Amino acid sequence: MSYIEKTDPELFEAIKKEAERQEYKLNLIASENYASKAVMEAQGSILTNKYAEGYSGKRYYGGCDFVDIAEDLAIARAKKIFNAGYVNVQPHSGSGANMAVYFSVLKPGDTIMSMDLSHGGHLSHGSPVSFSGKLFNIVPYGVSKKTEMLDYSELMKKAKENKPQMIVCGASAYPREIDFKQFREIADEVGAYLLADIAHIAGLVVAGVHPSPVPYADFVTSTTHKTLRGPRGGIIISKTEELATRINKAVFPGLQGGPLMHIIAGKAVAFKEAMSEKFKQDQVQTVKNAKTLCKCLKEKGFDMVSGDTDNHLMLVNLNNMNITGKDAEAALSKAGIIANKNTVPFETRSPFITSGVRLGTPACTTRGMKETEMELIADYIETAITNSENDKILSETSDKVRELCSRFPVYC
């Protein structure tokens, strides 16, 4: 009997059911993955008991000798995998990391140019409902209506017109490669700081599957889960020592008190795992799987935003399928496939309904699935969406998905 089962049977039952859901449902949520048992062991360790306000060697509490080792390991490993000079591993989240960057060099009312949420950006990049949209003047940019991809000449034009203090590149639902070098040139043209948010593609960057922004951006932020397969948390990479000093002050005492030392330990484990050849192979396979799934869906008549993918995710515009993103998400769920509704470029529906779904391959790749399975999954997706109101067919598809998942256990 586990400690949780003995102490809190109700919670234990919920965790047990969640474990079963993760095992037998097909996870195509682009921002989710499976952390290793080693990462989870670090997260559940006695390090959760320790307060450690400040930074390694300069704490406001005694008894930090060993948690200093954990943080030092996380920093050194992050520097190595990203080929970076300055890293802060204390942010509790990706949004918090972005907030720290803004507060380190901007003041309220300054102008930030960032990707519109409905075109693939992120809430923390300036959405009106986010702190970023409330505190700063946001100039949104989007994709070309013709190509559904970024048009860098248009971005240059917009930057010159608005002269932002900061430009944010990176996205939560953009399937194509981002040219960080061109973003640097645009930022330099108007004297803006450049922040690259690589929360979604960090694992791909580490493995060399996607170009790195580190040589170009003043700041790089990321979550440590998603393609990195670590614990839920954030990191910040700074280009210079002066910027790193600003970041450290913005994180603590600016935004946070005590860092989560058990999570930082989990980050250290994940960064070590990211140095392995297996990790690199998985990132390469993640993109191969995404390209295969995208190709198969396109051949079945689905409208794939921008026509292809260069990374771990794809966006499906469902307008030609006469189904909303909300209804497609529900149908897929009944078929045992977990995805999320998503706005598409030039969206006409509300964010609660949407015209699209976002699909990603990190989690199923971590399970060991490859191109052959992607072809099967495309069939299951087509069946679910074209039979969204037929519970019998959806149930039969769910059985097939369960059988597929049973051949690729999450934790062997």
Swiss-Prot record:
GO terms for molecular function: glycine hydroxymethyltransferase activity; pyridoxal phosphate binding. It comes from the Archaea. Its cofactor is pyridoxal 5'-phosphate. (6S)-5,6,7,8-tetrahydrofolate binds at L117, G121, H122, L123, E242, S350, P351, F352. The record marks H225 as: Plays an important role in substrate specificity. Keywords: Amino-acid biosynthesis, Cytoplasm, One-carbon metabolism, Pyridoxal phosphate, Transferase. This is Serine hydroxymethyltransferase. It comes from Methanosarcina barkeri (strain Fusaro / DSM 804).
